[in-house]
């Protein structure tokens, strides 16, 4: 009987230690950093906030897409060959997130974006707000970009949130 009590006490203490030592890492959420005037001006000029057709200055198709850009070569491949001058981005320290969200109508406002990093993936979170009032039913592309401190290269998911 004494051995059974000792074994029970040992198992209970072991269970307590395991339950208190949670090794799961929290997901890390990061927000875009301030971009230079040159970078902001480039995207203001070449990337509309919304359009009824995919942006011709970038290599987007006709669906929602997100590009995680970590080099000048990747940026060059994402833009039209008619754009000669790219903004100076230090890709040793930064990552550019660039994309389009295909929506059912133009009645949305883009509110914010962030990226969550976990062990397996990057998740780009996009938050839109539904505007009040009637809007025509026409496919509309919303565009976004964000400059981040260097992000790890991992598979990417998109989380589109409409409020």
What do these predicted ranges mean?
Residues 1-18:
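Sec-dependent bacterial lipoprotein signal peptides
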């Amino acid at each position: 009987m004494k051995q059974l009590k000792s074994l029970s006490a040992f198992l209970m203490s072991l269970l307590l230690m395991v339950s208190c030592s949670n090794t799961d890492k929290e997901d890390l959420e990061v927000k875009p950093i301030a971009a230079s005037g040159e970078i902001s001006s480039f995207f203001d000029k070449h990337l509309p906030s919304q359009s009824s057709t995919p942006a011709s200055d970038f290599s987007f198709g006709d669906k929602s897409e997100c590009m995680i850009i970590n080099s000048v070569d990747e940026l060059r491949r994402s833009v039209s060959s008619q754009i000669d001058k790219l903004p100076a981005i230090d890709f040793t320290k930064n990552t550019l997130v660039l994309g389009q969200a295909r929506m059912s109508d133009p009645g949305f406002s883009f509110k914010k974006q962030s990226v969550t990093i976990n062990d397996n993936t990057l998740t780009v979170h996009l938050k839109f707000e539904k505007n009040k009032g009637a809007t025509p039913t026409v496919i509309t592309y919303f565009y976004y970009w964000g400059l981040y401190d260097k992000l790890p290269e991992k598979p990417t998911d998109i989380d589109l949130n409409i409020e």
